[in-house]
Amino acid sequence: MRLLTLEEGTFAVRYARAVIENYLAGKKIVIESYPEVFNEKRGCFCTLHTYPDKELRGCIGIPEPIMPLIEALEEAAISAATKDPRFPPVTLEEMDSIVVEVSILTPPELIKVNHPKEYLEKIKIGRDGLIIEYGFYRGLLLPQVPVEYGWDVEEYLAHLCLKAGLPPDMWLAEGVKIYRFEAQIFEEVEPRGEVIEKKLL
């Protein structure tokens, strides 16, 4: 799976913003042409932060590559702005003081271990996003999260469990599955401003 160019990443962020602003204004965005890579099935997340204080304002996505990226991006953007249960819906006026971030994901792969303690060696902060599954419980953290909070791998796993509604040490239990994925991250420097690729390592 090839990486996106900065030009394609810039398009992704600009498109996510346009989708949100049109949706909040009661309009449907019509796009006639876009880079070919956006026809590929890829997972993605849209994250909104307040500007300039960078407080989280919404983050939702589609982790699995189940639809063309252009569609996944539209769904993730609208959901991040209006359906994140942690926050009230974003208003159109607020978009003047929000920066948009888009993460393009690699397909999740199961981390195989003989003993759960091996996760501590196999997971790399700044590279790996994680998904935990246990029965009906599921939680996901993007690779930028442990970097932003300064967590080590054990803290990362504990917070992953909490995100899924599980006890923090549940990653040590039998029957738990943990998947990893990588993300290419593009973000606005300021609202509607330059888009850069965010490097975690």
From Swiss-Prot:
Residues 7-197 form the AMMECR1 domain. Signal peptide: none annotated. Coiled coil: none annotated. Pfam families: AMMECR1 (PF01871). It comes from the Archaea. Gene3D superfamilies: Hypothetical protein ph0010, domain 1, Hypothetical protein ph0010, domain 2. PANTHER family: AMME SYNDROME CANDIDATE GENE 1 PROTEIN (PTHR13016:SF0), AMMECR1 HOMOLOG (PTHR13016). This is Protein MJ0810. It comes from Methanocaldococcus jannaschii (strain ATCC 43067 / DSM 2661 / JAL-1 / JCM 10045 / NBRC 100440).
